[in-house]
Amino acid sequence: VPHTRSSLLWGVAAAGLYGLSAAPGVVWADSAKLTLYALHAYLPSLNPGDHAGWVLLAQGWLGLTWFWSPTYSLHLLSAVAGAVVVAGVHRLLLRWGDPLESAHGAAAVLLVAHPLWWAAAVAESYTPALALVVVGALLLSRGTTPAVGMSGVCAGLAVAAHAFAAVLVLPLAPTGRPRTWLPFAAGLVVGSAPMWLAWIANPPDPLTGFSAGGGGSWSWVVRAFLSPDRWVRGVALVAGAMGFALGPIAIIAIVRRIRRGGFSRHPNPILAAVSLSALAALLTVYSPYRLHLMVSFVVVGAVLLAPPAASLRWCIAHGVLQVALYGAAAGGAHLVGRESLGVRQLPGRDNATYFLLPPKSWEHSAEAYARRLLAAVPENAVVLADFNPGAVLRLVQELEGVRPDVTIIPTAVDDALATPDPSGVLAGRIGEARAGGRPVVLADSWPPYYRVEELRRLGYSFAPCGPGLLVERAPDR
């Protein structure tokens, strides 16, 4: 009972921290996309980027929290799931027979780990997927047939929520007699239904309007996000992200744990180590834009495998140092003029604060951008956007019921960039809309995407339109 109480206390602490860190409204990119998917009940889908298992969870959660706005409610889903991860890992290590100090150390590391805290503050698939893995492992440790079957359901739903959850599920899966693994396998099939049912029905993506949830979507993901040429830079980025997530105190403690006592009492530590190494290697060639969140699977897996033994003083020191580290990193980036962090700065977004500080309670840039643009565009306009602002614009338009006269094409720029002649394709889109008598607005002016200078050379001219650009004149054709 005292051990159960201590696990609950860690969960309450995590729920408080993550709940206070939750974003109040719409957030850029995948968060906006996933919220739109939840509102449209977009499933089933085999596309790993559609996170169909998360959509199913979100549907149930929205039904329970009908009194909150959908955006805030789904941010809180991540916060609650993050708290389940922290408390669940603490309880799981005790269930495996590890010392109480190791469980405390693991919970302390996870509580303030950058990727987990960050993902727990916004509507994302990471913490729900991790929570399902941990809950499934706790059920599996009970050993009864119903519990093993439900463990399989949790594992299947975790993989359907985020494909990388398979890295943690595989080493935890039962082996041996069919009596042990058959209920788990049956549950796995049931839990992963939000994915495999797409072989029977494949609804259109509510963001793009295309049916992109079939089996061919996996090959698209490989082409779009994996590049072996990135591996040298990728090794440095993965090592840096892991170091930033764990911090110096935790890294020293984990290394000391491995040297002195080896691994935890994980049911399959060798396979777990191999799986985590494989994921880390994959992340070195993966698109770096989501790396700060993707490493959450490696962090949780590492802590389950080698939890550091910790006193209360150690836990407090680690937490204080990590918070100071995140603040110093964001402040330092501003001091040296590198607040962009070398990536695209979306309108109103400060990259150093946005990416390096996990709390999102002050994040309003996405909503402010969408409202400014939708207020400025002419009547009956067509807005050509790329995914980042496009998902936000579409979500705000739908949630607030504003500007139904405006047509937002949220991935028009992405589609153009996938062709040999992006500026020519964009020019064709502009010409098509203007031929129908409709004004055209570019959602942003970032040169690598919107090719404004190339379009000017083709005879187009532009005028400011809120945070976007209005196509003022087009060449005679």
Mark where each language-model region is.
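Loop-to-helix entry region of an early transmembrane alpha helix in multi-pass inner-membrane enzymes
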Residues: 52, 56, 66-87, 104, ...
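Membrane-interface alpha helices of multi-pass inner-membrane proteins
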Residues: 15, 106-108, 134, 147-162, ...
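Hydrophobic, aromatic-rich transmembrane alpha-helices
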Residues: 236-265
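Signature aromatic-anchored transmembrane alpha helix within multi-pass, membrane-resident enzymes
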Residues: 185-189, 307-341
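Extracytoplasmic catalytic/substrate-binding loops of multi-pass membrane glycan-assembly enzymes
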Residues: 20-35, 45-60, 72, 362-365
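Hydrophobic/aromatic-rich transmembrane helices and adjacent perimembrane loops
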Residues: 286-310
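Membrane-lumen/periplasm interface segments of specific transmembrane helices
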Residues: 181-223
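Short acidic/glycine- and proline-prone juxtamembrane loop motifs at membrane-interface regions
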Residues: 29, 118-126
